[in-house]
């Protein structure tokens, strides 16, 4: 069969076929699509059922045997062979922006806590786990991030088939339960069980529907819409460290975490109400439990995605860049205090990086949609982050003024990593496959994240300046490798030419 990404209705195409020793011939053919169940948000289209007809006779063509095929739609210039039909997406309106607001509220705790790990790590390393080594403590946060990304695979296929509401409710209960349990933790295994496993699992389950619902409402403005929704992570990263620092002193660790848990629970309830997909998926019921199991196993991890070079290098690039980002954010406060700054200054630096990150999400997202393109912006910002690590943090981290400048510039340049990664994935994917592809990327990221923080903790060791410099070099190299992978993916898609992409 000829596999065409999107054909909304029957159209007339002119195909030029050049295969083997046959002469070039023009065939006036009609493409039809049979209506059938779909796994996502183009419910009336099934690419596998596309049929070529010539002179009212069905023509069965093997797409692998066709070369030099060109096509044009006759008398329908608005139709195009692209992954998604932009006429299906509102790209605005009250309902669409309420979904963005709902995703924003949900990402305040989900991404906000990831951006605030330093506020928790720096406290427990000096109190509950004061006698535990940095490399051991790092496993708490490494496993939290790994489980967060790994559990995305549980929600990707489910979201494509069933929508968001079940995932939102389940993720909210698990996430909030883990945070409430965190308040009573005193040993490493308790922190791992409550925070790493429970809250991490809830984070991963929530991540896909919060990002995915926005993708079902926007196409042309998807970059800016996703950037606005992920600003919730920056808001959480601003508020949570300041709030925790104050509450640690006034009410202690237990009630500080409980108050944080109530705030996160409220935000997630709001998100569950507002963040809904545009249309309910139209799916074919499963005939047996074996079919259910087979489908979910195949949707959890589809290794065939990695056969696409453009997808493979986006996945690797995102994994390297986000692992570097979370590792640096986790140890930034501890590094600042090692350099002689007070705890107040260290926590304020975390807040400052997240505050500037708001601009780092919005401005790149705007330029990505309007002028430069999503991949181009992602390459520029990731490269800037690596450069700032090498030329500011590494040689001049002991100078408080330079460190402040670095924190602000780094916060801006890394702001788009979390916001534009799903947009770049969506740009090379059909919306019907977005959940599974997004989850597959984060499966790879989980595998990368598991060793990154422990390696960082081992490099830091006793916390000397020389040890931290080794840590900085390691994370800078990861960030640079992430930029290189995005460049390779872009080259696979459009080559070396300068264009909006």
Curated annotation (Swiss-Prot):
One of its GO terms (cellular component) is plasma membrane. This is Probable transporter MCH4. The keyword Transport applies. The chain crosses the membrane at residues 98-120, 135-157, 164-183, 188-210, 223-245, 255-274, 311-333, 343-365, 372-394, 404-426, 439-461, 471-493. Residues 121-134, 184-187, 246-254, 334-342, 395-403, 462-470 are extracellular. Residues 1-97, 158-163, 211-222, 275-310, 366-371, 427-438, 494-501 are cytoplasmic. PROSITE patterns: MFS. Pfam families: MFS_1. One of its GO terms (biological process) is riboflavin transport. There is a cross-link at residue 54 (Glycyl lysine isopeptide (Lys-Gly) (interchain with G-Cter in ubiquitin)). One of its GO terms (molecular function) is symporter activity. Glycans are attached at residue 131. It is a multi-pass membrane protein. Keywords: Glycoprotein, Isopeptide bond, Membrane, Symport, Transmembrane, Transmembrane helix, Transport, Ubl conjugation. It is found in: Membrane. It comes from the Eukaryota. Probable transporter. Does not act in the transport of monocarboxylic acids across the plasma membrane. SUPFAM superfamilies: MFS general substrate transporter. InterPro entries: MFS, MFS_dom, MFS_trans_sf, Proton-linked_MCT. The keyword Lipid biosynthesis does not apply. Belongs to the major facilitator superfamily. Monocarboxylate porter (TC 2.A.1.13) family.
